[in-house]
Amino acid sequence: MNPREHGKRSIDNETRSALKRQRPAVIWLTGLSGAGKSTIASALELALFEQKKHTFLLDGDDLRLGLCRNLGYSDEDRTENIRRIAEVAKILLEAGLIVIVATISPFSRDRRLSRELIGIEHFIEVFVDTPLSECERRDPKGLYRKARSGKIENFTGIDSIYETPAQPNITIDTLSEDPDLAVKRIISYLETNQPA
């Protein structure tokens, strides 16, 4: 086998995973802006790091500053944003990492396509369920206020839809669960529901 042929690798995914002594996965946190995705994702990354797991966090806000900086907020651009994130997550998964994705990803079809691209057996969808009213109350970046005043158009939850996941692997109710409990639940799911 020529390792330079497209799609051919001299080290397979299973070998990479064995070296890292972990099962790779993509933990995809979805929810409204201000729901708590980044907070939970950061706490999860730290908890897994403390368990000596090899992880990488892909935060939608950070990716908008680099990889996706040429995209706006039209439905088409949002779809392309999620496609790019899913492609990067898949590459990191194939490197044997536990990938944590924190992004609004408002459309169910984009989350479905991401799941299919990454592989159903490796994709853990976490719905960070926070009511719009609570997200607006938190509004850490002042985005809801700007959207309500017309300074931001096509803002998810205000004038652009968020399609609630129909069957997420995990639902986190941030009104009743703090980030530490959310992290424990995600790690428990990761330990008991991932293929060997």
Swiss-Prot record:
* Pathway info: Sulfur metabolism; hydrogen sulfide biosynthesis; sulfite from sulfate: step 2/3
Key words, A-Z:
ATP-binding, Kinase, Nucleotide-binding, Phosphoprotein, Transferase
Q: Which GO terms describe its biological process?
A: hydrogen sulfide biosynthetic process; sulfate assimilation
Among CDD domains, the record links this protein to:
APSK
- Spell out the molecular function terms from Gene Ontology: adenylylsulfate kinase activity; ATP binding
Span of the signal peptide: none
What the entry lists under Pfam families is as follows: APS_kinase
Q: Which reaction does it catalyse?
A: adenosine 5'-phosphosulfate + ATP = 3'-phosphoadenylyl sulfate + ADP + H(+)
Residues annotated as binding ATP are 31-38
Q: What class of enzyme is it?
A: transferase
Report the EC code(s) recorded for this entry: 2.7.1.25
Q: Which residues form the active site?
A: 105 (phosphoserine intermediate)
Purpose: Catalyzes the synthesis of activated sulfate.
Q: What PANTHER family does UniProt report for this protein, alphabetically?
A: BIFUNCTIONAL SAT_APS KINASE-RELATED, SULFATE ADENYLYLTRANSFERASE
- Which HAMAP family does its entry note? Adenylyl_sulf_kinase
The entry's family comment says: Belongs to the APS kinase family.
Q: Which protein, by its recorded name, is this?
A: Adenylyl-sulfate kinase
